[in-house]
């Protein structure tokens, strides 16, 4: 991919969004993700990376190479939260619309206990969650603005089915706030939720509790207590954020989706508000196992608009049908905004069918010779031009393991050798070259952080904290 987003020749002007499709073992990590990560030494076009890292191997193998080129490394680990930096989704709320975006991302990728798919329950849950999170953001101390406090509020919201005048502690909080700030966004949303009768309100609370159940695990509470990822600074300085997730258990993958949702929105807003529409450092998202992280809300709109802000998304899938399963009718819109598409090999029928059609046909010359023998022998030659698939589905299914097919917008598809990672100048810094280069993530996280002049800190009075 070219580094510049605005080449002088318009025919070369393409976005950096990439769709990579390859079956298991086709080399998606070795032949695409690692070579792109090692392109970290450009001085004229600095790049930050956000990498979905199944099993946590990519950060271990390439971390030292990034450190040598001045990168700040961040790790969020949903396999082992004790070996992770902290991520607090509420730390990135700056306005009422941010509250709505956070709740949308949460509800899109988690399940409540609503009844029969009735949209009423989702809407009611949304009202309650928006009101509680808005209350925490605008009224609670910074150290209490997290999901642990949100769960504590839910746990105190007892409902009486018989006594409509009964008030739980949270009702009293909002009643008091309503007297002080009657036009508060949190109060207005909570009043709408309180229109529900006692039995209905109890069902809403049960559904919210089920949706937030993962945050009740102590490890998750600790991991989301405060924030260290600094998602809003990815476009300010060279940073590599590794999102480590399990490729066999999707329980906590919704956190990864929430990170991507907030990341795209934060960076787009920052580019528009502070940098005149263009981030100083390009942010490239290498989303491996894209189908397993859940749905990123409005992705079809984001991939169409992030290019101008110096952001790009590289979606890595095993099959195209995975994208359709998650994004339904919007999958075609997403693919349409990927100016580069790479096929590394595979045998899934839908993928092969779509690719064979995209490759088109070639013209072949057909010669038919006839030779009739007998009393009146005759000879004839018939010539015609025919259309033939450039590569049929069965040919694509047995594609050489060392080859790939690349489609660039404005250029005919072509077959190429997969990139030899060992030829990259920065390969010598990886643990693939020398096991001594392996990054010990746990040791890295426990090191003493150096303080930089532009770092900001939040001062908290220890005496004001609630008892553990």
Where do the language-model regions lie?
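P-loop NTPase motor domains
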Residues: 2-311, 326, 394-418, 422-468
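Conserved ATP-driven motor cores of ASCE-family P-loop NTPases powering translocation/secretion/packaging/pilus
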Residues: 303-405
């Amino acid at each position: 991919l070219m580094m510049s987003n605005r080449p002088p020749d318009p025919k070369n002007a393409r976005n950096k969004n990439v769709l990579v499709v390859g079956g298991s073992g086709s080399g998606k990590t070795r032949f695409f993700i690692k070579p792109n990560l090692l392109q970290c030494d450009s001085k004229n076009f600095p790049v930050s990376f956000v990498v979905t890292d199944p099993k946590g191997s990519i950060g271990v193998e390439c971390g030292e190479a990034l450190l040598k080129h001045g990168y700040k490394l961040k790790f969020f680990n949903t396999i082992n939260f004790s070996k992770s930096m902290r991520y607090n989704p509420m730390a990135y709320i700056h306005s009422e619309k941010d509250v709505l975006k956070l709740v949308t991302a949460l509800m899109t990728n988690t399940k409540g206990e609503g009844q029969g798919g009735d949209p009423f329950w989702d809407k009611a849950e949304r009202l309650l969650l928006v009101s509680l999170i808005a209350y925490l953001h605008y009224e609670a101390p910074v150290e209490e603005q997290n999901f642990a406090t949100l769960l504590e509020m839910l746990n105190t919201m007892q409902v009486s089915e018989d006594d409509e005048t009964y008030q739980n502690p949270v009702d009293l909080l909002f009643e008091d706030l309503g007297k002080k700030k009657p036009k508060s966004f949190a109060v207005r949303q909570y009043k709408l939720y309180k229109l529900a009768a006692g039995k209905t309100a109890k069902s809403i609370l049960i559904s919210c509790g089920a949706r937030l159940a993962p945050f009740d695990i102590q490890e998750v509470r600790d991991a989301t207590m405060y924030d260290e990822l600094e998602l809003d600074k990815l476009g300010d300085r060279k940073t590599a954020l590794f999102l480590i997730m399990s490729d066999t258990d999707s329980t906590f993958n919704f956190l990864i989706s929430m990170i991507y949702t907030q990341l795209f929105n934060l960076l787009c807003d920052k580019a528009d508000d502070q940098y005149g529409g263009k981030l100083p450092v390009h942010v490239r998202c290498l989303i491996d196992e894209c189908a397993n992280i859940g749905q990123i809300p409005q992705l079809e709109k984001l991939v169409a608009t992030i290019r101008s802000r110096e952001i790009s998304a590289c979606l890595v899938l095993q099959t195209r049908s995975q994208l359709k399963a998650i994004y339904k009718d919007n999958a075609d819109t997403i693919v349409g905004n990927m100016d580069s598409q790479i096929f590394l090999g595979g045998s899934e029928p839908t993928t092969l069918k779509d690719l064979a059609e995209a490759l088109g046909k070639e013209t072949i010359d057909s010669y038919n010779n006839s030779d009739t023998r007998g009393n009146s022998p005759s000879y004839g030659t018939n010539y015609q031009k025919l259309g033939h698939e450039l590569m049929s589905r069965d040919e694509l299914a047995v594609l050489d393991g060392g080859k790939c097919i690349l489609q660039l917008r404005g250029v005919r598809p072509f077959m190429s050798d997969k990139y030899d990672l060992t030829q990259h100048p920065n390969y010598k810094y990886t643990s693939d070259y020398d096991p001594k280069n392996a990054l010990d993530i746990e040791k890295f996280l426990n090191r003493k952080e150096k303080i930089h002049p532009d770092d900001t800190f939040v001062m908290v009075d220890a005496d004001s904290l609630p008892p553990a």
